Each structure stands twice: as structure tokens, then as C-alpha cells.
A protein has these predicted regions:
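Low-complexity, Ser/Thr/Pro/Gly-enriched N-terminal "stalk/linker" regions
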Residues: 28-85, 349
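Fungal-biased detection of long, low-complexity, Ser/Thr-
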Residues: 292-368
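Well-ordered alpha-helical scaffold segments within catalytic/enzyme domains
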Residues: 30-40, 94-110, 151-167, 208-219, ...
Length: 368
């Protein structure tokens, strides 16, 4: 009886070991799958462009995010925001413009180039932008689109100033009063923000600072200094970011990766690697252990559709970090995230169609 029991225990141990080895091998095989890197070409541009092109002058449905001072504030979206009234909300309209600008900037022979310019030149006019400035100056709406929409507006400004063409120069001249206003709003707000906002949606401080820093490094030294100073104040001593808690059900940004992306732009490479290993221990060695693609259960639900955006924003952060650190595992994980949601964007649901092309394009541009 004793021999039988020992034999049973031995067999059970061997079977258990074999099962564990099988699981480990399966994980290893999954990790070794190589995903293709996205490219901006005529095909991908034509796919992405129509999302933004179709919505930047689509006025309804519309989410205004407005504070009413009295009954006279009740106006049509196109009256309140003559430049950026489409694509459901102000910030999506702004980054819809960014999407179209970057497609025609990077692909000079793009098939729909002239149609894009005609549409953009109707919205980014001097008169329209001055009305946008007036809205931001209203006593009841001074924090409008803080800081998410501000960040995307500076992305538009960055593109126009980087792009040395007659059309871009003219559009930037028209946009400049709003750009200056947003710069000043950043410089007024960040010194007063005692604690960073660490959520996976619009108010995320690291996202707002990261995009603004890209612009400021080229065109606004004063804003650059403020952002770098505040980034170190907020994030330099952070340790062990709980990335295993992510994602939240409505997230379109990764709080941990947005912070890691920002600090990549703030710290020298050697110092950054040390910071990253403290902030996200072992992440460089095995990023797929901590992140997998997020799945969307209902693309008609605007909040649940955020998770497609999360796949794209994770991808661009992983590209930024992985390319600088020459980390192929991060880049491959970025490719995996991108591929999953890119194939599902054209669902026919406006909940995602009004904004996801910008996130997808930004990831594509960061992949190279």
C-alpha cells in the first residue's frame, strides 16, 4: 500500500511539472509572436482621413461642456465655436484638424489633399479663432478644456509651425491668438496645481504636460521650463506604479505609461532608465507580463469605446520608450495593441469614429 501511495505521489508530481512546463511554453510562444509595425502610406491615410474629414463639420450630436452664465449663453455649437464645433466635442474637433493636417503634411501627394485644405481653411480663419478666444476668456468658462483640449490645440500649433508651407503659415497666423492664450493658461495653471491628476481620462496631468512639452521645447522656452520643473516635482520620486490595476473600465490613457512617456522627455537617458526601473520594476525586461490588449464589449457606448483609444495611447507610449531604449519587446507589444484596435475602428459607431483616428495616427507617427 505504501509503495502504491508513493508511486501515485511521484506520478502526480511529474504530471504537475509537465503541466507547468506546458503553460510556461505556451506563454513563451505567445510572447514570441511578432506583430507588424504600422506605416503611414496612401492606404492607411485614406482609411484614417475619412473619420476626421467626415466629422469636423458635423455639428450634431454635440457635447458642449459649457457653463451657462445666463440664458443668452444658449447658442448653436457652430456659433459658440465656429472653428471647432464638429466631431461631437471641442477637443475631438481640434484633434480631427490635427489628423488631417498631419496626413497632408506627411503625404504631399495624398489623393484628397485639396479637399482637406478647402475644409481646414474654412474653419481656421482669423474671425473664427478670435471668437474661440472670446469663449475662453468668458468668466464662466476660463477652465474650458483644461488641460486635454489645450494639449491638442498645441499639437495643431506644433504641426503648423513645423510645416514650412504657405498654407500652414497662413493657418498658424490665424490660430496664433488662441495658441498664445492656451500657453498663458498653462503657465498660470500648472504652478497652482499642487498635486497631479492621475486618472485614465481627459484630466490626466502627465498627458497634458507631455503634449505641451513637445510644443514648448520648440516654440515656448518659458512654458518648457515650467513643465520640466513641475514634472520633476510631481513624478521624480514615484515608485512602483500599480500598472497591474490598469485598465479602468472607461480609460483611454494609461496613467503609468503617460507618466513614463513624460519623464522620458524630461530626464537624460541614463537617469531615465534608473527612474523607470524604480517606477515600473522589471517592466523593461518583460512588458507583456503587465499589459495585454484591452477588449471593447460595446462600441456604441462612448465610455466603453474609450478602451480602443487606450490600446492606441498605450502603443504610442510604448513606441516612444521602446524606440529610445532600443527595447524590441516594448515595440512588439505596441504593435500588438495597435493591430487589435486598428482593425475594429470602422464599426459604424460614432462613439469611436469621431475621435479614434487621431489616436491611431499619433501611434503610427510614434512607431518610427
Amino acid at each position: 500500500m505504501r509503495k502504491i501511495l508513493l508511486s501515485f505521489i511521484t506520478i502526480s508530481f511529474i504530471v504537475g511539472c509537465n503541466q507547468n512546463n506546458s503553460k510556461q511554453n505556451q506563454t513563451k510562444v505567445a510572447d514570441e509572436v511578432t506583430y507588424g509595425k504600422p506605416q503611414l502610406n496612401e492606404k492607411s491615410a485614406s482609411y484614417l482621413y475619412h473619420f476626421a474629414f467626415d466629422c469636423i463639420d458635423q455639428e450634431y450630436p454635440n457635447k458642449l461642456g459649457q457653463v451657462l452664465g445666463n440664458a443668452t449663453y444658449l447658442k448653436e455649437p457652430s456659433e459658440l465655436h465656429p472653428a471647432f464645433y464638429g466631431c461631437f466635442d471641442w477637443h475631438s474637433s481640434v484633434h480631427g484638424h490635427w489628423t488631417l493636417l498631419n496626413i497632408v503634411k506627411d503625404l504631399p501627394n495624398f489623393e484628397y489633399r485639396e479637399a482637406v485644405f478647402q475644409k481646414l481653411q474654412k474653419s481656421i480663419t482669423k474671425e473664427n479663432i478670435l471668437k474661440e478666444v472670446q469663449y475662453f476668456d468668458d468668466v464662466h468658462n476660463k477652465s474650458f478644456e483644461r488641460t486635454y483640449g489645450w494639449a491638442w490645440l498645441l499639437k495643431v500649433a506644433e504641426t503648423l509651425q513645423d510645416w514650412n508651407t504657405e498654407e500652414a503659415t497662413k493657418m498658424y497666423e490665424n490660430l496664433e491668438p488662441l495658441v498664445e492664450l492656451v500657453e498663458n493658461k498653462y503657465m498660470e495653471f500648472l504652478p497652482k496645481l499642487k498635486y497631479p491628476i492621475r486618472v485614465g481620462e481627459h484630466p490626466n496631468t502627465a498627458f497634458g504636460m507631455s503634449f505641451a512639452l513637445d510644443y514648448a521645447k520648440k516654440y515656448s522656452p518659458e512654458l518648457e521650463n515650467i513643465i520640466i520643473e513641475k514634472a520633476k516635482e510631481y513624478y521624480m520620486n514615484d515608485k512602483g506604479c500599480p500598472i497591474n490595476w490598469e485598465p479602468g473600465g472607461f480609460d483611454f490613457l494609461s496613467p503609468c505609461l503617460q507618466e513614463a512617456s513624460l519623464m522620458l522627455k524630461v530626464l537624460p537617458n541614463e537617469e531615465y532608465v534608473s527612474w523607470l526601473d524604480t517606477f515600473l520594476p522589471n517592466f523593461r525586461n518583460n512588458p507583456s507580463q503587465y499589459l495585454n490588449v484591452t477588449e471593447v464589449t460595446d462600441r456604441s457606448d462612448g465610455k466603453l469605446a474609450h478602451l480602443d483609444g487606450l490600446n492606441f495611447s498605450r502603443a504610442w507610449c510604448l513606441y516612444e520608450i521602446g524606440n529610445i531604449l532600443q527595447n524590441d519587446k516594448m515595440v512588439n507589444l505596441a504593435n500588438k495593441h495597435f493591430e487589435y484596435s486598428y482593425k475594429k475602428m470602422d464599426s459604424g459607431e460614432y462613439a469611436g469614429a469621431h475621435w479614434l483616428a487621431s489616436f491611431a495616427l499619433y501611434a503610427v507617427l510614434k512607431s518610427n
